[in-house]
């Protein structure tokens, strides 16, 4: 350690208590320097956890392969231990906090024997931002330290801001693998028994047994969503599982938009979107603030402002390539930690979907020889890259603005092969909250459950909301009421299929066409037609330059079928029954309003002809 200990009494006392409990061999206070990062990466190489990649192909980058039992978030081992079970709600796992603490104290007793205890002070959000929060993670994993240096602003500069009296969220992590004297360490220490536990009232996090991703990098989902969502409810702001992007128009106007999608719906691709060439040539441009999490607070001018609390990307590698997301590929071209991807013979990385043809031979994520005909994936489906956000070519110049950026629209979307139209704008804030609360997505191979079933994932926050989901809906309703100029709310669905099971919408860069309409709606420039669900673009309101999209196909993308929507509304009921005791009563009325709107419309609502409003005057 290359600096004096901080003089924050609460922090020093907590570190001392943890050291007595966990019994590490030594304590290292992380300073966040490049030298420290390089030394720890070298230590991980010596331990066999890291392999240094080819410096000509991937400068300053490393590959780690985890234990096969430690490859993803463990939702069934994730607990919200609020004082009252009712406050956790039916969508979270709960255990009495007193019982849980006793259990954890038993597990953590002596769990760091033979290891170094690292103290990581970190800031979620730009240093000194009024929206930012400070956390301190104690861990026995150097893998966690180096990932946290990419994912957060960390080290001595954070302690300087914390000062003597500053508040912080204590985050305690251990892989749960103590070493007896002379015992050889494993390349990926972890424990079969795993607990990821949040104590919302005392704002603390305990994680045991896993060294992987969101289970171990406690600033990410644990602090930035589960603890922060509860803090936001108490203090009047929002912590959301949401990307933030900026849209620059040909006139130079900048509009910031947040978008929430469940997993496997293309969130990172959308955050780093590159417009189609005809729209680029007209001067349209997209910039990235963040790809995963947004903290949103009301500003003094009546608008809402958002920051990306993270400092890097923890992206899913499989499926990412230069066609689908060139910005993500550029982001992980150097200074990156790869986890559970495959290794090429020349010490570079590969994963499914990276190239059209796989290499003739690889070493797979479990260290075994791999060939294209061996019948198993080379990279784990949840393989990741950890890359600095500053390396993203589309990064917005204001991505570290401590005030945040002003938000004009929120977009919610899932993966639906039918039912939900390409895009529509909610009639008002409450209607928008309802559409986000009933967000559904068909399960893919990435999620547990039968493929094709619709899983309700309200606001894409189901695994990440740190308190009762119905109270969360109420908080959103109240948040909008308290703002003079709330953002507009939109629904999108890129995944609608035709009768032959083919996607109707091209997606990827062409999503810019929908985004352009959304931005122009917010600015009061774009037309729309009233549908039973909300305001929808007419064919002529969209920019089709460079895309062959017949009117009939567009009508198919935007049609609303009464029978299908009646079934959809019945399935909303399942969620509402689960949350009934605290569900905002407006929701039941809103459901009736949508039903009434469907019955007052044609059985199969579809856009017709080339009708312009001025045509009515003839």
From Swiss-Prot:
Q: Where is the active site?
A: 265
Q: Which amino acid positions bind Mn(2+), per UniProt?
A: 221, 241, 292
Q: Which family does it belong to?
A: Belongs to the phosphoenolpyruvate carboxykinase [GTP] family.
Where is substrate bound in this sequence? 73, 212-214, 263, 382-384
What does the protein in this record do?
Answer: Catalyzes the conversion of oxaloacetate (OAA) to phosphoenolpyruvate (PEP), the rate-limiting step in the metabolic pathway that produces glucose from lactate and other precursors derived from the citric acid cycle.
Q: Which GO terms describe its cellular component?
A: cytosol
Identify the enzyme class.
lyase
Keyword flag Transferase: no
- Judging by the UniProt lineage, the source's domain of life is Bacteria
Q: Which HAMAP family match?
A: PEPCK_GTP
List residues binding GTP. Answer: 264-269, 384, 415, 508-511
Q: Which residues form a coiled coil?
A: none
A GO molecular-function descriptor? GTP binding
According to the record, the residues making up region (Disordered) are: 375-397
Q: What is the lineage of its organism?
A: Bacteria, Pseudomonadati, Thermodesulfobacteriota, Desulfuromonadia, Geobacterales
InterPro entries listed in its UniProt record: PEP_carboxykin_GTP_CS, PEP_carboxykinase_C, PEP_carboxykinase_GTP, PEP_carboxykinase_GTP_C, PEP_carboxykinase_GTP_N, PEP_carboxykinase_N
Catalyzed reaction equations: oxaloacetate + GTP = phosphoenolpyruvate + GDP + CO2
Q: Which PANTHER family match?
A: PHOSPHOENOLPYRUVATE CARBOXYKINASE, PHOSPHOENOLPYRUVATE CARBOXYKINASE [GTP]-RELATED
* Pathway membership: Carbohydrate biosynthesis; gluconeogenesis
On cofactor binding, the record's note says: Binds 1 Mn(2+) ion per subunit.
> What is this protein identified as?
Phosphoenolpyruvate carboxykinase [GTP]
Q: Where is the composition biased (Polar residues)?
A: 384-393
EC numbers for this chain: 4.1.1.32
Please provide the record's keywords in A-Z order: Cytoplasm, Decarboxylase, Gluconeogenesis, GTP-binding, Lyase, Manganese, Metal-binding, Nucleotide-binding
Q: Which GO terms describe its biological process?
A: cellular response to glucose stimulus; gluconeogenesis; glycerol biosynthetic process from pyruvate; oxaloacetate metabolic process; propionate catabolic process; response to lipid; response to starvation
């Amino acid at each position: 350690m290359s600096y004096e200990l901080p003089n924050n009494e609460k922090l020093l006392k907590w570190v001392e208590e943890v050291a007595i409990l966990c019994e590490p061999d030594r304590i290292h206070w992380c300073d966040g320097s490049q030298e420290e990062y390089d030394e720890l990466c070298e230590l991980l190489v010596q331990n066999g956890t890291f392999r240094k990649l080819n410096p000509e192909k991937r400068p300053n980058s490393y590959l780690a392969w985890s234990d096969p039992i430690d490859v993803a978030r463990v939702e069934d081992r994730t607990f919200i231990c609020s004082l009252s079970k009712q406050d956790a709600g039916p969508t979270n796992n709960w255990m009495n906090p007193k019982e849980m603490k006793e259990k954890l104290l038993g597990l953590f007793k002596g769990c760091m024997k033979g290891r170094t205890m690292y103290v990581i002070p970190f800031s979620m959000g730009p240093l000194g931002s009024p929206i930012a929060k400070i956390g301190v993670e104690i861990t026995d994993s150097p893998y966690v330290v180096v990932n946290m240096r990419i994912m957060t602003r960390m080290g001595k500069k954070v302690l300087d801001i914390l000062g003597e009296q500053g508040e912080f969220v204590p985050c305690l992590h251990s892989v749960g693998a103590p070493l007896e004297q002379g015992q050889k360490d494993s390349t990926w220490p972890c424990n079969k028994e795993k607990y990821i536990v949040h104590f919302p009232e005392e704002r603390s996090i305990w994680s045991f047994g896993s060294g992987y991703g969101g289970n171990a990098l406690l600033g990410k989902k644990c602090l930035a969503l589960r603890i922060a969502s509860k803090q936001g409810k108490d203090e009047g702001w929002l912590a959301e599982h949401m990307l933030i992007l900026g849209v620059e128009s040909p006139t130079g106007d900048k509009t910031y938009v947040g978008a929430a999608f469940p997993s496997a719906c293309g969130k990172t691709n959308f955050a780093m979107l590159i417009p189609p060439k005809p729209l680029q040539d007209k001067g349209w441009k997209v910039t990235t603030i963040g790809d995963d999490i947004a903290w949103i607070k009301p500003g003094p001018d009546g608008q809402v402002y958002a920051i990306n609390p993270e400092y890097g990307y923890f992206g899913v590698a499989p499926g990412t390539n230069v066609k689908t997301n060139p910005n993500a590929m550029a982001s992980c071209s150097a200074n990156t930690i790869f986890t559970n991807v495959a290794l090429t013979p020349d010490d570079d990385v590969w994963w499914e979907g990276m190239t059209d043809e796989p290499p003739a031979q690889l070493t797979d994520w479990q260290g075994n020889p791999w060939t294209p005909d061996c019948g198993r994936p080379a990279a784990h489906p949840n393989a990741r890259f950890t890359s600095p956000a500053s390396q993203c070519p589309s990064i917005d110049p204001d991505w570290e603005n401590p005030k945040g950026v002003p938000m004009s629209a929120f977009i919610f979307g899932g993966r639906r092969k039918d039912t939900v139209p390409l895009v529509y704008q909610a009639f008002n804030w409450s209607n928008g909250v309802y559409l986000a609360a009933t967000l559904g997505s068909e399960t893919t191979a990435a999620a547990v459950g039968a493929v094709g079933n619709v899983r309700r994932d309200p606001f894409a926050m189901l695994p990440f909301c740190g308190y009762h989901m119905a109270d969360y809906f109420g908080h959103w309703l109240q948040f909008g009421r308290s703002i003079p100029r709330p953002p507009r709310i939109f629904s999108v669905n890129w995944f609608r299929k035709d009768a032959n099971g083919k996607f109707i919408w091209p997606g990827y860069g062409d999503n810019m066409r929908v985004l352009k309409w959304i931005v122009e709606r917010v600015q009061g420039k774009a037309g729309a037609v009233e549908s039973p669900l909300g305001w929808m673009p007419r064919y002529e309101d969209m920019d089709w330059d460079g895309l062959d999209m017949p009117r009939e196909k567009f009508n198919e993308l935007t049609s609303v079928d009464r029978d299908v929507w009646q079934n959809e509304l019945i399935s909303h009921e399942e969620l509402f029954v689960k949350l009934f005791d605290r569900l905002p009563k407006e929701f039941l009325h809103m459901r009736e309003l949508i039903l009434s709107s469907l019955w007052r419309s044609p059985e199969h609502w579809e856009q017709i002809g080339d009708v312009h409003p001025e045509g009515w005057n003839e």
